[in-house]
Curated annotation (Swiss-Prot):
Nucleotide-binding in keyword set: yes
This protein's UniProt keywords: Aminoacyl-tRNA synthetase, ATP-binding, Cytoplasm, Ligase, Nucleotide-binding, Protein biosynthesis
Stretches for region Aspartate: 198-201
Protein name per Swiss-Prot or TrEMBL: Aspartate--tRNA(Asp/Asn) ligase
Superkingdom assignment: Bacteria
The protein's role, per its UniProt record: Aspartyl-tRNA synthetase with relaxed tRNA specificity since it is able to aspartylate not only its cognate tRNA(Asp) but also tRNA(Asn). Reaction proceeds in two steps: L-aspartate is first activated by ATP to form Asp-AMP and then transferred to the acceptor end of tRNA(Asp/Asn).
PANTHER family named in the record: ASPARTATE--TRNA LIGASE, MITOCHONDRIAL (PTHR22594:SF5), ASPARTYL/LYSYL-TRNA SYNTHETASE (PTHR22594)
Reaction equations catalysed: tRNA(Asx) + L-aspartate + ATP = L-aspartyl-tRNA(Asx) + AMP + diphosphate
The protein's assembly and partners: Homodimer.
Amino acid sequence: MSMRTEYCGLVTEHLLGQTVSLCGWVQRRRDHGGVIFIDLRDREGLVQVVCDPDRAEMFATAEGVRNEFCVQIKGLVRNRPEGTVNAGLKSGKIEVLCHELNVLNASVTPPFQLDDDNLSETTRLTHRVLDLRRPQMQHNLRLRYRVAIEARKYLDEQGFIDIETPMLTKSTPEGARDYLVPSRVNAGQFFALPQSPQLFKQLLMVANFDRYYQITKCFRDEDLRADRQPEFTQIDCETSFLGEQEIRDLFEDMIRHIFKTTIDVELDAKFPVMPYSEAMARFGSDKPDLRVQLEFTELTDAMKDVDFKVFSTPANAKDGRVAALRVPKGGELSRGDIDGYTEFVRIYGAKGLAWIKVNEKAKGRDGLQSPIVKNLHDASIAAILERTGAEDGDIIFFAADRAKVVNDSLGALRLKIGHSEFGKANGLVQAGWKPLWVVDFPMFEYDDEDARYVAAHHPFTSPKDEHLEYLETDPGRCLAKAYDMVLNGWEIGGGSVRIHREEVQSKVFRALKIGAEEAQAKFGFLLDALQYGAPPHGGIAFGLDRIVTMMAGADSIRDVIAFPKTQRAQDLLTQAPSPVDERQLRELHIRLRQPEQPKA
């Protein structure tokens, strides 16, 4: 008989009366009046093994096994006695009467029980191998596998070719910091780990591969959050001879296919499309969570002439904004709730949080409760009530500051209230999945510190055709042929139509204050390739980690990656990064400089 004939979790009634050989780990061992029960676990689940004292040698071995011992058992599949069926297990109607028990490897006492749901992340990541044995982690990583498989199936059917691109490439520090790799044979020179395969996939389009994809690692040396890792996985795609709408349709269908085949979710038949400017105006975010049924009301123009300087000063500032957020039934929020929200928005740079409770709208000023009403004229109050559509029992929150502060603070407040218990109880958030496309992004952002424009996405994104003339006259007016797929407030994919003409790419570099010499040094290989009849092309990259995190309902992408880093970019399992031998440094022609100590 083979070492293993079945998986533990797949032993069911169809094997009744058969002898099976199983391998796995001891989940639990119970001694019930001379009969030992072992819950044996493998990747497919659990099966109950019964060890009778009739077989003395086997029983003696069973008495010595403990949790997480790796064992092999051979035995007879039989029905469980009446009244002992476990409906929660796939194998819950049967048990295996053990004939032979072999300990393949003993285990020291684990530092935690696998069913402990209150483990710290530090403990989990330090003992990641044991953490990965837990059913939830097994589920998450198998879900990740299925998502990757379904992406490949779809792309294969659509004529895409899986092509690997280099992991050691050229540093082009235009976005996040690169991870640098020193070259031993080229002293003083460095490779960079790719932040994305962007330029290589464009070169593949010039090389006539027409449709490319790969599921690949990317690397960015940036501060980490719950949805970021220094190394992450993209479903990276590029295609030739398709327009922006066709590209979006193609990959919208892919995401719809993946959700249906992996978690049986039917996404919208057609994803809504929203310009960037509308998303910022209504939600203060370029990745709005459409489940939350709250929107901003624009008040900037209405507050320019009020005497209340808190509103009028930002309303008249070039980069200022005044916006309101009406919360239906928010009048029942306590002063403690409001104070808590006030402290919350300070995290995002807001100086405070103005508010008005609408008790009796028909009474005008007298029907309102607020510390700011005394600073506003009746006409201004009427304008606020009319624009927000406020009703009795509502509360209106206000933000007035630089537009970025208003968008960040009021946008965060919108999500916090919407997803709160109050929001759920009052229908301010919907269940389910709310996808959309956000399009027409600004091509450039102005960097005040460097006094120049920088690429909002990357410098290879094509401007909209009607905005080409602005590249040399007014870059700030340029909109890009860029698009992000957003799902429940997460950007799960982003892409664009690329620049395929060398003269346009050179104009973009000039708009970014990248001179001809610098452009040739950094991107000469691309500029040269674009001169050889480069086709119109575009693409998109999806964050595999993010997609699986959402599907699994996980709190962090670290819960869907086998061996992730912490928020300090450390691997607690292997203790990476770590010092290296002086000899290795000499071979790489590197000398370490100690970081400067802060002055006392």
